[in-house]
Structures are given as structure tokens and as C-alpha cells.
Amino acid sequence: MVKKIRQKFNKAFIVIQIKVLSLFSKRKAAERALEIFSIPWRRTNKQPYGIFLEAEQLTFDFQGTTVRGFRWSRAGARKATILHGHESSVLNFETYIRGLLQKGYEVIAVDAPAHGLSDGKSINALEYRDFVIQLHEKYGPIQSYVGHSFGGLTIPLAIEKIAHDESFRLALIAPATETTTTIDGFFKIIRSNDRRMKEEFEKLIIEIGGEPSAWYSVSRAVKNIKAGILWAHDEEDSVTPLADALKVKEKNYPNVKFVITKGLGHTQIYRDEKIIKTIVDFL
């Protein structure tokens, strides 16, 4: 209860802080907003358990940040990795790991910076993409990928940069399809409809990565991907709306298969036994 009150207080303080900054400088307000946008507001307190205690422990440096994770069945028949969502951890994907190990796969699962067991305070889509690329270069070639939410966005962004073919498999679970949608949602959270401040926010994104926020898009990246893609999304997802996913579905890409569920929402979908089995079988 105390934790929830503290979180509400922090959010209220941030809203006021950004509004005050915007009175004096749209740029400063945008800088603060982007900083908050890149920081997970919660971090899981889970510690390794069960199958994670049996794994090889992985620790390495990513852009000056120590990240930590696990590897099972080294030199397995095929390599797979798991990319968690915002404020989540690979510790939430035990069932996927067990299923992939039963198929004889080598499994690599590492918490992204600022998440779970890894160090760091912030991460953006560009950094998460580069994190996936580093995983592939360090432990790969990795041919099978599972990603939920934020992780589901960064997999296509990474794969379009990685040499790959039709043998690769990508399972996207409720991916954050359009970063522009995520940003719109964020501005609602901070209760801002300041157009000029939002324009400065967009300028900052371009300065950091050289591309506008619309570039960080599954619908854009998927056009450049040869891999087979299984895309699972729920009709009642209030975090990453199905409407964005349906625009991709309408394109009828031959390498993309959709599984649309109802009643699972954004989080329960990746925990659903039928979805897990479908994904493990696909990979």
C-alpha cells in the first residue's frame, strides 16, 4: 500500500515538474519528459528460482552497464532468446524456457538494462535494439526470438539489421507496434497536450538516434524481414492496442501469421498456456 502511494506521489510530482518547466523552456520540459519516458517506474523484486538456479550465469557489459542473465543447454541444436517487456524480467518466462529446452534448444535470457537483475536506470528503443544485436553477436547466431511488449518492438528493429534468412523465427507477443502510439499514451499519463513541448520531444528523439519516433515501428521494420513471424495480440489490450497490429495484418505478409485472442489483455496473453505452446511449437 505504501509503495502504491509513493508511486502515485512520484507521478503527481513529475506531472507538476514538467508543467512548471514548460512555462520557462519547452526544451527543458521535453528533456525531462524524455528522461522519464526512458526510466522504468517499477523494477521486479524477483530473484532467480527453480530453473534459473540450474543455468549458467551470464554477466557482461553493454554500453557501460553491467547486464545479467542465464544460459541453458550450451551448444544445443538451435539458439533462442527471450526479450521481456517494460518493467519486466526474463524471470517471468520460465515456462517458455522449459518448452524450448525440451526441443533441444540452447536458450539465452538476459535482463535488459534498468530491468530485473541488470544494472542501469534507463533504456530506450534504440538501446534495446542494440542490446539484442549484441546478444546475437556475443552468443549467436540466435535464430529464434520471443519478445513481449517493448521486447516485441525491439526484435524486428534488431533483425532488420542482422543478416538473416527464412529459417529465423520471431514470436511477437503484444508488441509495442508503434512508438508514436506509446508516446501519445505517455503524454496522457503526464497530462500534457502542449504541442510545442511535444515537438521538442520529437526533435530530441531525432537528435539521439537520427530517426523520428515513427521509425521505431514494427509495421515499418517487418517489411525488411525475411524471418517467419508469429504475432499474438489480444482484442482487449489496453497498453499496445490491437488497432495498430491490425494495420499490419491487413498487409497479408506471407511470412507473418497472426493469433488474435480475447479476454487476455496485455499481460495475461504471454502467460496463457495455449499461447505458450503455440509459440514454442512455432519456434
Show which residues each predicted segment covers:
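An N-terminal hydrophobic leader/cap segment in hydrolases
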Residues: 3-59
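Short beta-strand/loop motif that positions the catalytic acidic residue
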Residues: 225, 231-233, 237
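Hydrolase active-site cap/lid region
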Residues: 162-211
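Short alpha-helix in the alpha/beta-hydrolase fold that links the catalytic acid
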Residues: 96, 227, 241-249
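Catalytic histidine-centered segment of alpha/beta-hydrolase-like enzymes
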Residues: 264-274
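Alpha/beta-hydrolase active-site loop
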Residues: 122-143
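Conserved alpha/beta-hydrolase
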Residues: 90, 97-119
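Gly/Ala-rich beta-loop-alpha elbow adjacent to hydrolase catalytic centers
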Residues: 146-147, 151-155
